[in-house]
Amino acid sequence: MSSEKSGLPDSVPHTSPPPYNAPQPPAEPPIPPPQTAPSSHHHHHHHYHQSGTATLPRLGAGGLASAAASAQRGPSSSATLPRPPHHAPPGPAAGAPPPGCATLPRMPPDPYLQETRFEGPLPPPPPAAAAPPPPAPAPTAQAPGFVVPTHAGAVGTLPLGGYVAPGYPLQLQPCTAYVPVYPVGTPYAGGTPGGPGVTSTLPPPPQGPGLALLEPRRPPHDYMPIAVLTTICCFWPTGIIAIFKAVQVRTALARGDLVSAEIASREARNFSFISLAVGIAAMVLCTILTVVIIIAAQHHENYWDP
């Protein structure tokens, strides 16, 4: 490369054999560069790289010698190609950042935050945390005439206007009302129009469809009287069984066995009715037989008379 750069100029004849001394065809006029080209080929390429053009050596009929001669002649034997548009340094555009600065992408704006201010004085802070009150005991059955409180204990007062700040427990005034509890049908002493202390009786409430008051369970009947009557007057074998079942009913009631008492009561009733039915049937049959015998006796007497 250094030998090519330091070769003889075109005015000195070449001593080497052809084709070095062959005449060269006329070269195309080069595009004038924006600045004066440097003397060396290395600086020539460096300049055109900076100015946006590239210089390519033109190959003629002389092969490598033509290329060397063209390199010595410089711009007269080279073709200049324009630099692509994307390699050209862009000029400063309107609103563009200065060179050497990086542009960050625009982020979406922050969501809108609404800050509400409450006018007026804030409610006082709640009192110090205290242990919660124990749960109220479950209501139990009480004797007639006792009262049952509807609220257990005092729980505070409600502030004026009925406004309760959020986050504060609701406080109510202690209730002093008591509801008297009386069984249905029991007399109680109350303030009636007749005067204080007058005893009155609550009427039973009206019963709707499907509503019934629970009444105490009645003990089963022993059917002892009808068992004795049927034993004496009607049919004594079944009557004795009915009396025995009636005694079992009383024994079961004495020990509190209602189921056995009900079973024995039904059996005593059935045997008593059997004794009654057998006794009635026997009376009817005896009456019929008596009538038949009387009629037959009269007919026999008439037959034997002269």
From Swiss-Prot:
Intramembrane residue spans: 276-296
Keywords: Cell membrane, Membrane, Signal-anchor, Synapse, Transmembrane, Transmembrane helix
UniProt keyword Disulfide bond present: no
Alphabetized GO MF terms: signaling receptor regulator activity
Extracellular side: 245-275, 297-306
Topology versus the membrane: Single-pass type II membrane protein
Highest taxon of the lineage: Eukaryota
InterPro entries linked: CD225/Dispanin (IPR051423), CD225/Dispanin_fam (IPR007593)
Effect of a null allele: Decreased Gria1/GluA1 and Gria2/GluA2 density at extrasynaptic sites and increased density of Gria1 at synapses. Reduced cell surface expression of Gria1 and Gria2. Reduced phosphorylation of Gria1 'Ser-863' and increased phosphorylation of Gria1 'Ser-849'. Reduced synaptic transmission in immature hippocampal neurons. No change in basal synaptic transmission in mature hippocampal neurons. Shown to impair tetanus-induced long-term potentiation (LTP) in 8-12 week old mice in one study. Another study shows no effect on LTP in young mature mice at postnatal days 24-36.
GO biological process, alphabetically ordered: learning or memory; long-term synaptic depression; long-term synaptic potentiation; protein localization; protein localization to cell surface; protein phosphorylation; regulation of AMPA receptor activity; synapse organization
Biased composition (Basic residues): 40-49
Biased composition (Low complexity): 64-79
Chief location: membrane
Comp. bias intervals (Pro residues): 15-36, 87-111, 121-138
Start and end residues of each stretch annotated as Disordered: 1-144
Transmembrane segments: 224-244
Compartment(s) of residence: Cell membrane; Synapse
Tissue: Expressed in the brain (at protein level). In brain, expressed throughout the hippocampus with weak expression in the olfactory bulb and neocortex (at protein level).
Gene Ontology cellular component annotations, sorted alphabetically: glutamatergic synapse; postsynaptic density membrane; synaptic vesicle membrane
Similarity annotation: Belongs to the CD225/Dispanin family.
Function: Required to maintain a pool of extrasynaptic AMPA-regulated glutamate receptors (AMPAR) which is necessary for synapse development and function. Regulates AMPAR function and synaptic transmission during development but is dispensable at mature hippocampal synapses. Plays a role in regulating basal phosphorylation levels of glutamate receptor GRIA1 and promotes GRIA1 and GRIA2 cell surface expression.
Assembly and interaction partners: Component of the outer core of AMPAR complex. AMPAR complex consists of an inner core made of 4 pore-forming GluA/GRIA proteins (GRIA1, GRIA2, GRIA3 and GRIA4) and 4 major auxiliary subunits arranged in a twofold symmetry. One of the two pairs of distinct binding sites is occupied either by CNIH2, CNIH3 or CACNG2, CACNG3. The other harbors CACNG2, CACNG3, CACNG4, CACNG8 or GSG1L. This inner core of AMPAR complex is complemented by outer core constituents binding directly to the GluA/GRIA proteins at sites distinct from the interaction sites of the inner core constituents.
PANTHER family assigned to the protein according to its UniProt record, in alphabetical order: NG5 (PTHR14948), PROLINE-RICH TRANSMEMBRANE PROTEIN 1 (PTHR14948:SF21)
Protein name: Proline-rich transmembrane protein 1
Biological classification of the source: Eukaryota, Metazoa, Chordata, Craniata, Vertebrata
This protein's encoding gene: Prrt1
